[in-house]
Amino acid sequence: MPLDQEFEQGTANGDEMTFIEHLEELRWNIIRAVSAILVFTILAFIFIEEIYDKIILAPSRPDFWTYRMLCKLADFTGAEGLCINKLDFELQSREMAGQFTMALLSAVIIGLLFAFPYAFWEIWRFIKPGLKPSERKISRGAVLYVTFLFMSGVLFGYYVVSPLAINFLANFQLDPRIKNQFDITSYVGLISVLTLACGLTFQLPVVAFVLSKIGFLNPRFMREYRRHAFVVILILAAVITPSPDVLSQVLVAMPLTLLYEISILVSAWVEKTKKAEAELEAKQEENDALSNPWNPESDM
């Protein structure tokens, strides 16, 4: 029987695990999570050549899906600046073990991405038994929500943010005599950072839920500073878009704005739930006080 199930049964029976037992359970959770990462890393390394050709190097070619969609959008709207049909740069490896090192690093990153749902589930199954019944009810489906948001952010970073950033950096030119010859480590590092950063950024509703639950955040604060948040989002979109066209900035700003609005709704829902729980608890205490024969108020 898994250790977390034993803990839940023990909690239900009024028994508590010792500190050593908690550490033992956490150790096995970590071992299982690391094992999953290792398995996916090995699989990624086995197929690393196909992964580089079809996935990692795909945004460096003008026939990438995002570039083709932008060209279609440019034809439809008449905004020629949106169309990306030329990426004037070369990739090279300047170290003897450069390509092998990048193969290992890329395999590890891919292993982390694919093992994330299971690794988070292992962490969650350790935390969940220690929550109150009301907290478990509110956080039901946490693994599903976190995984969905993270993977959505990864896809957004790969298909939207990374291609726009690559195009901007590849076509930025100080002088025609300067040729762009990027090292493979720089290219892979850029895609990895942007993709993982977007995956974490898409956790904004989850962060809003946690902060609202512990009382550090409320929907009134988020609504009050909504305009400030929109300005930050627009600045961020302007930095990574390939041209000053408004449409290209909107492509990046829209999902981030939507996430902020969803976070406001999440915070409001948490606040409403906390008020309902407080009222229910107060009513329960009042009923207990009235039913207590030793309570002077019950004799009146």
Go through each PLM region and give its residues.
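Membrane topogenic/interface segments and analogous intrinsically disordered interaction regions
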Residues: M1-M300
